[in-house]
Structures are given as structure tokens and as C-alpha cells.
A protein has these predicted regions:
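Hydrophobic targeting/anchoring helices
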Residues: 1-146, 249-253, 257-260, 268, ...
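Structural motif
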Residues: 182-192, 220, 311-313, 363
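C-terminal beta-strand-rich structural cap/linker in extracellular carbohydrate-active enzymes
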Residues: 183-187, 385-398
């Protein structure tokens, strides 16, 4: 919020549950510093005989580190009863190593805009005022009804994109803002503030978005994008997306398109059937749509071209390293950016690359608790093989 810079607030300190909560804090402007309080809190529920605070600390740090590499907070800390840590020297050793890693990270990344392959806007009814928190329920707690959508935001929190959050009112006030974007993402259930609800009855909204895509922009819809029953359609961008939801009004329509096309750019790195989380029922495809995944004649993923632009439909995408790669490839494909794949890129989706070109540095980070092998691609497309220890981060000069 712009008010942070005018109310005399010195700093914002927040608890870090994942990458989204980290970005919610670190993206705040107009304060002297931002600080993240990491888990575990120094309370007896973790710091007791037989407890494993190191495990929780590792999980929390590795999850948040992706986001810190995109937009660092200024300080890190913990909260609770310090005395409880005295019986866990291995925890103190891990925190020392974590702090040293943070200092190096901060030195290389603070104040430097990292390499961003595309400009991405998450479109909902709130826009910037709920940046990163739009799919968050009580500080990133798991909710069955929400995790399939929150995964999109979590993946974006540590991905090499220039991410912004825009509202439908922003588009109505100035449709020209879309010209500065590469792709729009609309994610959530229909008839909610996440996807817009009744705002789709305003023709100016659908006209602006259709124009953006028709002229070459990308659109990714997750769940029930543009979902609102109006003028014979539930998905108001059904013709653009190439899919529609059967709500009972078109049961007598023949639906012939069920053939899957799994050999697609978007799915090239998948190692197992795609995890759509809760997924969606009753989604069908139009005849000129390319279905990537359907299960029991319910479309879970599809792509469709609209004018010069491209659209991707996904029924849900919980956060995982593999799903993060699927979203990455979806964004590239929707923006005709396949040629940009091998720029600051890791062939292994468990490993990520972040480049700080202005600073002349880049890093490769292993997001897992196991050794990993990968091929790292530099900005010019050249590459080198790399083996990494669990959780390791390596820094290089460009």
C-alpha cells in the first residue's frame, strides 16, 4: 500500500511461512527496512526432547530462499524463548550457516533487479493491495479449497519473472497498462474476487483482454478463469481460452474433442502424471483446442491460439518443483517465448538459476535435500554441467 510511506512506519516485520509470505513482506515499499521472522518459533512444541528444530528450519529457509533471491528482505530473525535453543547446538550451528548464506545473498542481490524473462500480471479484484496475499488463508495455511490455486502464486514468488498484481478497476481506468505486459494470469473459482465475478458483465473488461491477447499477448487461466454465468456462457473468455464449463445448459451439445496431445513444449520436463490438485470437473474443449491432459473426459490442461496470442488453461497447480516448471513453460509458450528457454536456466527443475546481470553475478541453487545433477545455461545459451550438494547455493561471475 502507498500509505506505508506516509504513516511514519519505520519497518515491517512479518512471519515467513513460504515464498509468498516472504514476497508479501519484501515487496513493501516506503519503509526503512523489512524483516522476516523464520520458523520454527522457539516454543516448546518444537524445542522439546525428541524435537527436530533443524528439520523445520531447513524446510522454512529453503522454501523462502527462492523468493529472497528475487526480492530480498533486509533482515532475518527468529522469535520465542531463546533459552530453549541451548539444548539444540546443531540448530544453532545451522542458523549460523543460514545467516552467513543470507549475508552473501543480500550482498549480491540487494538493490539489483534480477533477470526477468517475461512480465507477468496476476489479475483479480484487488490488484496491488493484495500482492502475494491474494490466495493466502491465515498466513499460508493449507486449505483443500485453495492449495491448487495458491501454488501458482508460490511458484511465481521465486521465478524469474517481473510479477505485478493488477485489478479489473486498473484496466477500466487505463486499458493501456496491458501493453506493458507479456502475459495475464487469472486464477481461482468462478464468481469470486479472485476471478472477477460480475465484473465480466462489463464489456470493456473482456474487450480489453481479448484485444491484448489477439494482438500477441498471453493468457493463462487456472481453475474457473472469467467464471460467471452470463449471456449463455460460464467462462466469459471461453472462446479465447478454447474451453468451457458444462453447467447443465449445454448437455445436448455434442462434444467431440477429447484427444490428448502430451508431446507439447509445456509438458516436456514432466516425469509423472501432472498433479492438478483438486482439479476441475465438467470442463470441455472446443474443436480447435489442443488438449494436453484430460481425465475421464474432463479437461485438465489445454492450449488455444487466439489471433496472434496464445492461451493456456490449467484446472489447478499445487506448488511443487515440477509444477513450477510447468508454469514456467506455460508462460514462455503463451508469449511465443520458447526460444528464451535456455537463458539462465537449469535442465533439472529441482535446481534454479538467478542472474544479477547489472552486478555481474549469477547463482545456482539446489532446492532439495538431496544431491542433484543439472546442466546450467548462461544468458548467451552456453552451458556447463554441475553437481550440487543438498540445499547448496553456488555463486559465479558472469
Amino acid at each position: 500500500m502507498e500509505e506505508f510511506s506516509t504513516i511514519g512506519l519505520d519497518a515491517v516485520v512479518g512471519s515467513v511461512g513460504n515464498g509468498s509470505t516472504l514476497r508479501l513482506i519484501s515487496d513493501i515499499e516506503g519503509v526503512r527496512y523489512t524483516e522476516g521472522r523464520f520458523l520454527p518459533y522457539f516454543f516448546p512444541d518444537t524445542f522439546h526432547e525428541g524435537g527436530d528444530p533443524v528439520k523445520e528450519a531447513k524446510e522454512n529457509w529453503i522454501t523462502a530462499r527462492r523468493a529472497i533471491l528475487r526480492k530480498p528482505i533486509d533482515r532475518i530473525g527468529y522469535g520465542g524463548y531463546l533459552k530453549l535453543t541451548l539444548d539444540f547446538p546443531e540448530f544453532l550451528d545451522y542458523v549460523e550457516n543460514m545467516c552467513n548464506e543470507f549475508r552473501e545473498l543480500y550482498t549480491n542481490a540487494k538493490g539489483i533487479t534480477p533477470y526477468c524473462v517475461k512480465k507477468v500480471a496476476v489479475l483479480n479484484s484487488w490488484g496491488k493491495i493484495r500482492s502475494w496475499g491474494c490466495h493466502m488463508v491465515h498466513h499460508a495455511l493449507y486449505q483443500k479449497q485453495n492449495y491448487s490455486y495458491a501454488g501458482i502464486i508460490e511458484a511465481l514468488s521465486g521465478a524469474p519473472f517481473d510479477v505485478r498484481f493488477i485489478s479489473f478497476d486498473d484496466i477500466l481506468a487505463n486499458p493501456e497498462i496491458l501493453k506493458d505486459l507479456d502475459v495475464i494470469i487469472n486464477v481461482g473459482d468462478g464468481d469470486t474476487a479472485h476471478t472477477g465475478g460480475g465484473i465480466w458483465e462489463n464489456p470493456a473488461i473482456s474487450a480489453a483482454i481479448r484485444e491484448f491477447v489477439y494482438n500477441g499477448g498471453g493468457f493463462i487461466g487456472v481453475g474457473e478463469p472469467s467464471g460467471h454465468q452470463f449471456q449463455g456462457h460460464y467462462l466469459q473468455l471461453a472462446d479465447m481460452l478454447g474451453v468451457e464449463k458444462e453447467t447443465g445448459f449445454t448437455l445436448n451439445y455434442d462434444k467431440y474433442n477429447w484427444e490428448e496431445h502430451p508431446d507439447h513444449f509445456i509438458l516436456a520436463d514432466t516425469t509423472k502424471p501432472v498433479d492438478f490438485g483438486e482439479g476441475k470437473k465438467n470442463i470441455f474443449a472446443y474443436e480447435d483446442t489442443e488438449i494436453l491432459v484430460q481425465r475421464e473426459k474432463e479437461v485438465q490442461m489445454a492450449v488455444h491460439e487466439f489471433g496472434k496470442g496464445r492461451c493456456v488453461y490449467i484446472s489447478g497447480l499445487p506448488y511443487s518443483f515440477e509444477n513450477s516448471r510447468i508454469l514456467y513453460r506455460s508462460i514462455l509458450w503463451s508469449t511465443h517465448g520458447e526460444k528464451d528457454l535456455h537463458q539462465w536456466f537449469s535442465s533439472n527443475f529441482n535446481v534454479e538459476v538467478h542472474a544479477y546481470v547489472k552486478n555481474g553475478r549469477f547463482c545456482v541453487v539446489n532446492n532439495t535435500y538431496a544431491r542433484q545433477k543439472t546442466v546450467v545455461y548462461r544468458g548467451d545459451g552456453s552451458s556447463f554441467p554441475l553437481e550440487m550438494e543438498a540445499n547448496e547455493i553456488k555463486w559465479y561471475n558472469i
